[in-house]
Amino acid sequence: MKTYTENQIEEMRRISDETENLYSPYACRNAQACRQYYSKYDTEFVRSQFSVDADKIIHSPFFNRGSDKTQVFSFYKNDDITRRAAHVQLVSRIARTIGKVLRLNLDLIEAIAIGHDIGHTPFGHRGEFYLNEIYSANTGRFFNHNVHSIRVLQILSG
């Protein structure tokens, strides 16, 4: 584990504080990150918890399993059909651009953008629609792939 001098720590805190001071009043602050477990080595001013989340998502097997899947189902070969990996990258870039203009937390935006499709059902939104009908009829609740993405990352990845 790398140790930092007091001067380095102070400089990193200063930079982190300056960044947070640029946020809109509506932005989620890094200190608002909720964690089930905190590491004693967490250093907010080096990497925010949201940045750590984004890295965990990228390195999860669930993220990698979807990388070569298509966004839509096709009976014929079509090079113009987007793969999920490209879709997630595009969503992340667009979301970060919008977030930058609105002065929001870009680390949080990136984590949300890259993890938003992990809980997607087979056959995309149409599959989600049918699964939601079945789930709702049996439980009275609704299925949402965005919420299921969190469930997958929290429960299935341990």
Q: Residues of each region from the PLM?
A:
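Active-site flanking loop/helix segments enriched in acidic
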Residues: 38-45, 49-59, 63-86
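Sequence-structural signature of the catalytic-core scaffold of metal-dependent phosphohydrolases
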Residues: 2-42, 59-64, 89, 93, ...
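A sequence-level detector of short, solvent-exposed, charge-rich linear segments
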Residues: 72-77, 114, 128, 137
